[in-house]
């Protein structure tokens, strides 16, 4: 294993950690690491791995936003509620590093639903659905990252 491969492996590991602990953009970091490896390896297999990683990343991003969003809509959570959650998630990201993005989203959904529905009892089920949507989104992104990492490992052995 050469130095570039080891560094790329570490970057991929950091990217996977960044998906769970959102300090770094995990999936873009993993994708960029595979691009670095493919450009350094200069092999057909390397570029096939990069192409596959690109397709997987795009598919993962699509599913990461499409599936939880559909789930929220199915559960009766409106787009304005989702946008309120997104706005407070952005604020939370800067106010409370790492966990603020999650807390902000949940708080935004809760406050929006509370103002629409009037009571805590009516707003809380929507808030729980928002938590499930967050977990689904993170799960999809993590699975995508693991799939790209596995593809890269296969590529490393194929080019060795």
What residue ranges belong to the model's regions?
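Interfacial segments of multi-pass membrane proteins
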Residues: 29-45, 88-93, 107-116
């Amino acid at each position: 294993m050469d130095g570039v491969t080891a560094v790329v492996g570490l970057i991929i590991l950091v990217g996977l950690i960044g998906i769970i602990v959102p300090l770094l953009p995990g999936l873009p970091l993993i994708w960029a690491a595979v691009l670095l490896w493919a450009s350094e390896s200069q092999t057909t297999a390397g570029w096939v791995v990069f192409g596959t990683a690109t397709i997987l990343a795009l598919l993962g991003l699509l599913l990461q936003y499409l599936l939880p969003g559909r789930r929220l809509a199915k559960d009766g959570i409106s787009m304005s509620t989702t946008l309120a959650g997104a706005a407070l998630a952005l604020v939370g990201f800067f106010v409370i590093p790492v966990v603020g993005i999650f807390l902000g989203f949940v708080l935004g959904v809760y406050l929006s639903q509370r103002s629409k529905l009037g009571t805590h009892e009516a707003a809380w089920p929507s808030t729980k659905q928002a938590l499930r949507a967050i977990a689904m989104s993170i799960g999809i992104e993590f699975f995508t990252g693991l799939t790209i990492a596995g593809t890269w490992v296969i590529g490393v052995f194929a080019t060795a």
